[in-house]
Structure formats: structure tokens, C-alpha cells
Amino acid sequence: MKKAIAYMRFSSPGQMSGDSLNRQRRLIAEWLKVNSDYYLDTITYEDLGLSAFKGKHAQSGAFSEFLDAIEHGYILPGTTLLVESLDRLSREKVGEAIERLKLILNHGIDVITLCDNTVYNIDSLNEPYSLIKAILIAQRANEESEIKSSRVKLSWKKKRQDALESGTIMTASCPRWLSLDDKRTAFVPDPDRVKTIELIFKLRMERRSLNAIAKYLNDHAVKNFSGKESAWGPSVIEKLLANKALIGICVPSYRARGKGISEIAGYYPRVISDDLFYAVQEIRLAPFGISNSSKNPMLINLLRTVMKCEACGNTMIVHAVSGSLHGYYVCPMRRLHRCDRPSIKRDLVDYNIINELLFNCSKIQPVENKKDANETLELKIIELQMKINNLIVALSVAPEVTAIAEKIRLLDKELRRASVSLKTLKSKGVNSFSDFYAIDLTSKNGRELCRTLAYKTFEKIIINTDNKTCDIYFMNGIVFKHYPLMKVISAQQAISALKYMVDGEIYF
């Protein structure tokens, strides 16, 4: 008996509940009854909810596995492929669609379209009528998909425009703390869930970890947004804390952002203030733990993740801390004999960078250049967004997406950090002189707060422990080059040096 292989596909997951799949199966069963000299292979290729318009099914779906099986000889010549119609194989542009058909036929695989019982084989490539028919079917399928795609895009474009101009709701889909009103024209917050959100933000502002917050909610039998008790987890809380819908913003997906679709402010009803939301983001985006289990405050590294070794790029760590002794900053690669840079006294570095620069950072920027600081961050945000957009485009053609996805994740984190810094700069400016000098650097809470402020103020600090100098990159765009660490440069001296700044850089 001859072997037949079935391929079934539909484009939208919503079609799963429709008749598309049953119809295709019915056509295959009816054909096999009439053609009793064929048997159906146990392997059936199905792309359920995968579009053929852009060829996704041929890149990552079951159809791509079918093509690989043909090219590697796992499916032998003389096999027949059963499909409902040619548009199941491709809805791409005519040239690409015909090439896919030719690829199958040239490997000795016959194709039978069950809707019209047409047989395509290798001889069909030399028959004008068969080829023209296939081209016309491919052309029609592509045009239908183009029209559907255009209609959907125009529909969503109008919905987004209406949402921007008048706040019209685009879809009933909304965050779990909201619901549609009876008229289906506005979103209404759930009072109990809003109280839960406020509690979570309060706990986070107390600098509790995500696990500690989850434990608190579970211990107090606080229901999650599915109505279940003791079901909170740290990942759910992390996503909630970062959700801009809490301050009324509708955020498009990665891919939508890559196509230039922007956020819609005021789309959802606000349930917390901007100040509270962005204050929590500063905690969330800092790449260090919320609390140190040690009782010795001096073990808290004020420049953690910020200060890097000039020789190898690794983040500097603290060493030989005991009691009230500050110890040293050292490259972690030194103990592994992979970096030969010496350690440097920590008290010298901290005094020069923390007491003189960080505590006076509001003055390390001429008033007339405040706009430039905003522009620097805005340009950085645009550059990061363009990099993300380019990687999103690469995702559609790259065979290995894991590495690209990781790059997008890291860039997105950097983008969010820059966005929070810009928001802080525009809304509150940099913390005032008195705010900084109220910090108690001998206490655990004071040092943790100082560490967060340093992370927010300095983009990075590149330290050369041989020369006892460093390059300091401020988040506002200013750069101090070769800043000395063995002698004290007062804040006033550093501020006075701003008059010699060229292209945002000052050399010491």
C-alpha cells in the first residue's frame, strides 16, 4: 500500500473551538475511504494556531519538521501529502509559496488538495495549467491574508487612536484588580484588591524582600487576584510591583514597541501615585539584595555593582572588614590569580566618592545644564529602545532565540533603570543636601539607603587601584576622568571644576 501523510493547519488559536480542524480531518477520512490503496501514516503534522502568512509555520512549526524530514530522507519519494488546500501550505507571497511547493514536489512527494481533489506531482512543474492554477491559488491566499492583516491593523490603529484621544476602551482585557462597568465603557477598580496592592507597596517601601512579602500575605490569609488564600509567590509580586497599569498606563508588548507603538497614559484608572510607584522601582531595579543578614553595617558595600575594576571589568567587593574597620576594596579575580591589581583602602574611596560627591551630587551640575541632563537620559532611552527594536526584528529570523531574548531582557532592565532616573530627575530633581547628610552611615538602614542612592546617582565607576584614581560616570551624563582617591578633593573644588567641562567630561 502507498503511504499518505496528513498536514493540517489553522491560523488563530480561536479557531480551535470552531470547525476548521474537524473539517480537515473529515476531508482526509473521506479521501482515504475512496482511495483504499493508501494508508495514513501514524505521524500527522499539525500547526494549530500558527499563521502561514509570514511563513512562521515553515520556520518553527510542524511544517518545518515536515520539510526537514523530506530533506533528510525520512519521508521517501512516492509518499503523498494530503492537505485541505494549497493555502494550508503557505499564504506567503507568490514566489515564496510556489518555491515551497516545488521543494516538496522535487523530492518526489505528491501533494493532493482535498477541497478540489487536485494532484500535484513533479510532472506538474512542467504543465502550464497546473502551475498557473497553483500560482493563482497562492496569489489569492496571499491577497486574502494581506486584506485580513490590513483590516486588523486598521481596526487596532483606530482603537488606539480613540483610546489616546478620548479614553475609549480598546478591549475588555484588563489587569486583575480592574473590571468593566455595567455599560462596558469604563474600568472600575476592585476596592479589596486595591487595598492589597497598597499593602504590597507599603511592605516593599519598608524594604522587605519579595519572599518576605509573599510570606506575610500568605500568613495573613490575604487572597490573591484569583480569590485564593496562601497562594502568593515572589514572581507574582515582582510583576505586580513593575506593572505600569497601576499608574494608569497601558504598555504595549515587546513586539508592538518594536513597531513604534507607544504607551497610552491614563487608559486605566490610577490606583497608586507616581511617586510611590517610581520609589518602588528604584528598589526593584537595584541589583543587590534588600537586606544583609549580618549585624555589622560595615559589611554593606556602598558601591556594590557600581564600581568596576579597570583591568578586568569585574565588580569590586569589600575585604578584611572587621568590627568598625572599613577594610579594603578588591577585585574578586585577584584571589583567583586572574587579576593582579592591588586592593585599595575603603575609607579613602568612600570618603571621596560618598561624602564629597554623592552627598553633594545635586550641585554637580550647573543649573543651566539641567536640560542637558534630561536630554542625555532621553537620548540614552531612545538608543536602548532602538537596540531592543532591532533585536526584536532579529527574533523573527534567528534560528537560536535564547541568546537574543537574554540580550533583550538585559537591555530592557537598563532601559527601565534609565527611565526611572529620568522620571526622578524631572519630578523631584536630585535629593537635596540635607537629605544626604541626614543619612547615618554607621547604621544598617542608613548604609542600605546610601547604597541605593549611589546606584541611582552613578552609572558606573571604573577604578584603577594601581594609580589610585577612578573614572566616575554620573547618571546625568557628566564624567569625572582620573579622579584622585589618595587626596581629598572637596565638593566645592569638584563643583568649581565644572566650568572646565568639555563635552560632559572633566579631567583631574
Curated annotation (Swiss-Prot):
Keywords: DNA recombination, DNA-binding
PROSITE patterns the record matches: RECOMBINASE_DNA_BIND, RECOMBINASES_3
Any one GO molecular function term: DNA strand exchange activity
Domain of life: Bacteria
Active-site residues, Swiss-Prot/TrEMBL: 11 (o-(5'-phospho-dna)-serine intermediate)
Domain Resolvase/invertase-type recombinase catalytic stretches: 3-163
A biological-process GO annotation: DNA recombination
A Pfam family that the UniProt record links to this protein: Resolvase
Location of the DNA-binding region in this protein: 175-290
InterPro entries, A to Z: DNA_bind_recomb_sf, DNA_bind_recombinase_dom, Resolv_N, Resolvase-like_N_sf, SSR_resolvase, Zn_ribbon_recom_dom
More about this protein: Encoded by the cryptic lambdoid prophage DLP12.
PANTHER family: DNA-INVERTASE FROM LAMBDOID PROPHAGE, SERINE RECOMBINASE PINE-RELATED
Record protein name field: Uncharacterized protein YbcK
Lineage: Bacteria, Pseudomonadati, Pseudomonadota, Gammaproteobacteria, Enterobacterales
